[in-house]
Amino acid sequence: MSREDLEARLRAIGAERYHDKHPFHHKLHGGDCTPDQVRAWVINRWAYQAAIPMKDAAFLSRCADPDIRRAWRSRIEDHDGGVDSGGGLRRWLKLAEAVGLDPDYVASGRGILPATRFAVEAYFHYVREQPLLQAVASSLTELFAPKIHENRIEGLLRHYDFADESSLSYFRKRLSEAPRDVAYGLGWVLDHADTPEKEDMACAALIFKTDVLWAQLDALWGAYVDGHVPPGAWRPGEGMA
């Protein structure tokens, strides 16, 4: 398979399976979520956000090639930031505060749905333990992220009073960060998936990652749209500022 054909195959996975197609995102971006449904999303998405720099650190610890480490370490800096300026994690907590939550409560991880936690932990262990090709390929959902961030910014600004440039700064910043990150990751996968077996492995890794993202939204829907909140998960009124 040519590089162009493999890239087309990877992009087709996103076209079919990326979580921008999930009903919860349609509900959120269309202005149909209640304030508590938005809060539940912010709380549970934190589990994924907080794991990103840790999974990237785990990935770096496995890389003997300094060129890979140099290219990859900016991902940690994007989310952790500096002591004073912070990064993506601090910007996410700005969103938490804007929707009425106590940022310390959100950062504590209390109230996260069990299924969300399991999905995030599965992703962390996948990146830490699978061959480098699959670990890198699992990051290629970033190919599809700018579109969902654009739709989210537009939808939240249109429909929700909490939304402004400060509260949505995480998504605005990712519009420039994600394309830079994924350009390297995509090139690396196209260079190293050089047999049919490796092409299949790369595609399976991307499918796995789309499943991780989709499962988190399924959990949110079941708990906070259908109303089946499991024991120990966040309930409206908890963790408020």
UniProtKB/Swiss-Prot annotation:
Instruction: Name the domain of life.
Output: Bacteria
Q: Name one GO biological process term.
A: sulfur compound metabolic process
Protein name from the UniProt record:
Pyrroloquinoline-quinone synthase
Q: Which Pfam families match?
A: TENA_THI-4 (PF03070)
Q: What is its EC number?
A: 1.3.3.11
Concerning its family, UniProt says: Belongs to the PqqC family.
- Supply the source organism for this entry: Ruegeria pomeroyi (strain ATCC 700808 / DSM 15171 / DSS-3)
Concerning Gene3D superfamilies, the annotation shows: Heme oxygenase-like
What is this protein's function? Ring cyclization and eight-electron oxidation of 3a-(2-amino-2-carboxyethyl)-4,5-dioxo-4,5,6,7,8,9-hexahydroquinoline-7,9-dicarboxylic-acid to PQQ.
Chain segments annotated as transmembrane: none
Reactions mediated catalytically? 6-(2-amino-2-carboxyethyl)-7,8-dioxo-1,2,3,4,7,8-hexahydroquinoline-2,4-dicarboxylate + 3 O2 = pyrroloquinoline quinone + 2 H2O2 + 2 H2O + H(+)
| GO MF term set | pyrroloquinoline-quinone synthase activity
InterPro entries this protein is in?
Answer: Haem_Oase-like_multi-hlx, PqqC, PqqC-like, Thiaminase-2/PQQC
Per UniProt, the keywords (alphabetical) are:
Oxidoreductase, PQQ biosynthesis
Pathway this chain belongs to: Cofactor biosynthesis; pyrroloquinoline quinone biosynthesis
